[in-house]
Amino acid sequence: QGASLHLTVNKNIMVDTTDFIRPRLSDHYGIPLLQSKVDFAIPYMDEDIPLYVDPFLLWKSPSQMDNGQHLSVITAFNELGRMYLDDKQDKAIETLIYLSECAEVGLGTSNKRMGRPISTVKAKEVLDLFQAITQVSQLGFKHIEQIQLLVQDISKDRISDIACSLMKSFLIDYTIQECKKYGIPLSLSKISYYDTKKKSIVEETTNLPINEKTEQSILFVPKRWLRFSPWLNYDSYYKDYIIADINKEYDGIKNRIQILEYNRHHFDQVEKY
């Protein structure tokens, strides 16, 4: 493409990507990677990939590693609910707000690889489910996607970000492993993540790929975890399940709030779905 070349401080060749309309990380570094040949979704440098982590794919995966990651996500999320019930509400709310945005993975619809976390009010609304629903209070959630069917404005992007945030420690190691395999340059970077053992947000300095313009760390995600829409989602629940199951006419858009309220009072319907 007639792109000029220049050198980074670590002497890795980096391509001037001004000629690329939507440069991926492989274009940026001039590394000939084919998406079909690598395990991870090759990220764009300046915008999100319009895909999302579907936790259900980890749950149903034949890989024990994927199953283990799903279990760790559910366990950590339910422990957050326990924290909320144990009079540590401020810490639980603060943590959920942090978990609700995982910009480093670059998944979603942002054209700047940067979204916004949920509000304090929305975080409290989610955590209140651990008080309001008896089954959740006693046993926790089996799938975090269930939250989409219970709280307004919580959808696939939030579910994906929460899952990625709770797996961020794994994704850091995974990214480093894949970068070393394909010769992708790494730079010293500070990155925060939720430590599930300490039950707190910690910061680590490690070597990761970065966007030099924004200095944002970049994390890779296994492509087998990604879908455009999660297996468990509101539209499927509304169109394919709830109307047929309770035999009642609903306008899913107009009455979405009423359906979410119905779900909170009939959580057994959600679990059956």
Residue positions per predicted region:
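Long, contiguous, compositionally biased segments that the model treats as domain-scale units
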Residues: 7-185
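The feature marks a conserved, polyanion-engaging helical scaffold used by nucleic-acid processing enzymes
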Residues: 191, 196-273
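Short, glycine/acidic-rich hinge or "gate" loops at secondary-structure transitions
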Residues: 182-194
